[in-house]
Amino acid sequence: MKLKDTGLTAQDIKDKVKKYMIETYERFDFIAETAEGMYLYDENGTPYLDFYAGIAVNNAGSRNPKVVAAVKDQVDDIMHTFNYPYTIPQALLAEKVCKTIGMDKIFYQNSGTEANEAMIKMARKYGIEKYGPNRYHIVTAKDGFHGRTFGAMSATGQPGNGCQVGFGPMTYGFSYAPYNDLKAFKDACTENTIAIMIEPVQGEGGVHPATPEFMKGLREFCDEKGMLLLIDEVQTGWCRTGAVMSYMNYGIKPDIVSMAKGLGGGMPIGAICATEEVSKAFSAGSHGTTFGGHPVCCAAALAEVGELLDRDLAGNAKKVGDYFTAKLEKLPHVKEVRHQGLLIGVEFDDTISGVDVKHGCFDRHMLITAIGSHIIRMVPPLIVSEEECDKAFDIIKETVESLS
């Protein structure tokens, strides 16, 4: 939809949002009217260099032509059916995903938090059915993030702050341990623990990758204790970190993995994949979703996955991510640069505000996000080139120098 076709001004649109919408976001002060590849464009055609990709969603670029074509073709055939009949996009995507990431079964959702809810439910049901009614406890990481619905929010290790504030008691059955501390995770487990749930990179927590020793140690410990390893790949999945799934960087395999964001090419879809044994915890009536596995979203995801794999965008994420982070370490006031592929966090010293850097980059027509007091996060489309990273670096450098 174009602004010129509405008879309204840009300010009219902003006013309507403020009047009618429940706002929980700090918006960029522009109207994103069109997008293509590495850029968003406002109603005047002004380009904005996109280094947030809808928060790690548009991995194969905004409005990828093959994804757009797949959506248009599917809309011409059938849009929504619920999950009573078989649909072709569901079946083809299920096979593609399971074979690509080495898992046995898939269950479709609509978002990342829904995928994590399903993962929690499956793990608890598996534990109770196999070991008895008390085997439901799950250990997650402090400062992690798993979503904003109640189960996922309760799994989020931010007690007393962050997304848990103001909602009363959290769902019972979770404990938190420090990230990358294998001993602390082992100590947090009890005879009632059925699973450890972990992000391979803590995105909202400041972009902190897990160490190989930690991830491999969790896998070995879960195997030893008859527990499940649940890996949240909502943000890290689908080539973002230099591998198709981040857990592949560690040479391990989860019992259940969640995904969303980068799977759908801009369309809302989430999923969990599980081993054959664990997947049997779900049967008719165990879980469900009206829109999960939506034919249009599955068609988009099938095209997106094809693009990611055919163009080796995992390889590009690793190559360009290494190139870009080496440059970012030369920025003034940098305390640390952390990354895995093209999931990048830059932490500045106490004199530089991450929010101020975000705003300064926006003023220079570049889009990034800020997390914490002094950290910026960048998750560009995986099609990004070294030349576009050079441009981004110059914008960030100019911004930081202006704030010094």
List the predicted regions and their residue ranges.
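Conserved N-terminal phosphate-binding loop of PLP-dependent enzymes in the Aspartate aminotransferase
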Residues: M1-S404
